[in-house]
Amino acid sequence: MVDAFAGTWKLVDSKNFDDYMKSIGVGFATRQVANMTKPTTIIEVNGDTIIIKTQSTFKSTEISFKLGVEFDETTADDRKVKSIVTLDGGKLVHLQKWNGQETTLVRELVDGKLILTLTHGSAVCTRTYEKEA
């Protein structure tokens, strides 16, 4: 099931990203740049290891993990978080915890597109990616 997520995905639509970034504490200047950026996400599956690379002119990140195993992550906005990713009903659910807070990043495939839903408290952002050929 995870194999379906593999590929190179380009951001084509983003809703409420600024509200989400404000909610997790991202500063004004960083939000301005991040809002203008159209990142590419590359998802690779290598046995039981999943690699997610996010590349943009703003910042590039890479995480490597196994489903259900907690790992340390430094986010694009430099938060140091404890993360765990699980597969739940065909969705990749990524939970990040830091300083008594938590946020979820849920990736799901809908009509051939990758939908990323970011949630922190009442802030909900939806980012839509299309697969590159």
From Swiss-Prot:
Binding site for (9Z)-octadecenoate: R127, T128, Y129
GO term, biological process aspect, one: long-chain fatty acid transport
PROSITE patterns with a match to the protein in the record: FABP
Modified residues (Phosphotyrosine): Y20
Modified residues (Phosphothreonine): T8, T30
Residues bearing PTM Phosphoserine: S23, S83
Molecular function, one GO term: long-chain fatty acid binding
Keyword annotations of the record: Acetylation, Cytoplasm, Lipid-binding, Phosphoprotein, Transport
GO cellular component: cytosol; nucleus
Entry-linked InterPro entries: Calycin, Fatty_acid-bd, ILBP, Lipocln_cytosolic_FA-bd_dom
Presence of the UniProt keyword Protein biosynthesis in the record: no
Subcellular localization, as worded in the UniProt entry: Cytoplasm
Residues that coordinate or bind hexadecanoate: R127, T128, Y129
Modified residues (N-acetylvaline): V2
Reported function: FABPs are thought to play a role in the intracellular transport of long-chain fatty acids and their acyl-CoA esters.
Family membership: Belongs to the calycin superfamily. Fatty-acid binding protein (FABP) family.
PANTHER family found in the cross-reference section: FATTY ACID BINDING PROTEIN (PTHR11955)
Entry's free-text remark on domains: Forms a beta-barrel structure that accommodates the hydrophobic ligand in its interior.
Listed name of the protein: Fatty acid-binding protein, heart
